[in-house]
């Protein structure tokens, strides 16, 4: 099934949030699935069941946006890849848990492409460092919303960013959870390279393929809208 990839550059969170909901509400059975790849200015987002107490510093200077995804609080900022998955689960015959697992596998394979071992953790959505001095640190976050059988929101991967804003929150509701980025683990790939790798893996897994069958970049339908 075709997937349109939109490279949105640096875009304010509110604009993407409003656009995702509008896109999902306007979908028809023939609307192509889309992946939006974006980098946000600094912002905290709090899931619909999130506890505001997980924001530990009231005057951080970073705006807080309450959203309708699952999960607790997280941070988005420069140097982080955010990928929004606008997917018709019914058309692809996917259960929500299956979609989450495929997204997690795509992230794990992306990190492995840069010699970073990572894994999922039971009961804690996201991806975590598997070994070394930062074992257990969170390197990618995940949160979805399903409306009328279609997903929006998505995931974030920390590439090379200022990690200090994470110290002002309990990431995803876990007090004391370390958050790390790829650069701190020795990866030298830049944001754009990692984003291209991630998109290939995501599309492969949406189609139920293995990593070896990931689509070449020239096969992606792209738009800079």
Swiss-Prot record:
The active site is at residue 172. Disulfide bonds: none annotated. Keywords: Acyltransferase, Cytoplasm, Transferase. Residues 29-210 form the BPL/LPL catalytic domain. Its EC number is 2.3.1.181. InterPro entries: aa-tRNA-synth_II/BPL/LPL (IPR045864), BPL_LPL_catalytic (IPR004143), Octanoyltransferase (IPR000544), Octanoyltransferase_CS (IPR020605). It holds the Pfam family LplA-B_cat. Pathway: Protein modification; protein lipoylation via endogenous pathway; protein N(6)-(lipoyl)lysine from octanoyl-[acyl-carrier-protein]: step 1/2. GO terms for molecular function: lipoyl(octanoyl) transferase activity. It is found in: Cytoplasm. The record marks 138 as: Lowers pKa of active site Cys. The keyword Cytoplasm applies. Substrate binds at residues 69-76, 141-143, 154-156. It is an enzyme of class 2 (transferase). CDD domains: LipB. GO terms for cellular component: cytoplasm. Catalyzes the transfer of endogenously produced octanoic acid from octanoyl-acyl-carrier-protein onto the lipoyl domains of lipoate-dependent enzymes. Lipoyl-ACP can also act as a substrate although octanoyl-ACP is likely to be the physiological substrate. In the reaction, the free carboxyl group of octanoic acid is attached via an amide linkage to the epsilon-amino group of a specific lysine residue of lipoyl domains of lipoate-dependent enzymes. This is Octanoyltransferase. The lineage of its organism: Bacteria, Pseudomonadati, Pseudomonadota, Betaproteobacteria, Burkholderiales. The gene is lipB.
């Amino acid at each position: 099934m075709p997937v349109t990839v939109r490279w949105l550059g640096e875009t304010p969170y509110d604009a993407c949030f409003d656009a995702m909901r509008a896109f999902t509400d306007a979908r028809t059975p023939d609307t192509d699935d889309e992946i939006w790849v974006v980098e946000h200015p600094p912002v905290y987002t709090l899931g619909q069941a999130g506890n505001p107490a997980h924001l530990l510093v009231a005057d951080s200077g970073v705006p807080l946006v309450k959203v309708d995804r699952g999960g607790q609080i997280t941070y988005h900022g420069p140097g982080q890849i955010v990928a929004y998955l606008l997917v018709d689960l019914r058309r692809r015959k996917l259960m929500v848990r299956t979609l989450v697992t495929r997204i997690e596998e795509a992230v794990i394979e992306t990190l492995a492409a840069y010699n970073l071992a990572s894994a999922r953790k039971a009961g804690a959505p996201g991806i975590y460092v598997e070994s070394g001095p930062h074992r257990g640190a969170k390197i990618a976050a995940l949160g979805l919303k399903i409306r009328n059988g279609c997903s929006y929101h998505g995931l974030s991967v920390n590439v090379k960013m200022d990690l200090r804003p994470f110290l002002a929150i309990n990431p995803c509701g876990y007090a004391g959870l370390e958050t790390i980025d790829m650069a701190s683990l020795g990866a030298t790939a830049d944001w754009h390279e990692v984003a291209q790798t991630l998109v290939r893996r995501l599309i492969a897994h949406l189609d139920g393929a293995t990593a070896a069958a990931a689509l070449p970049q020239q096969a992606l339908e792209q738009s800079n809208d």
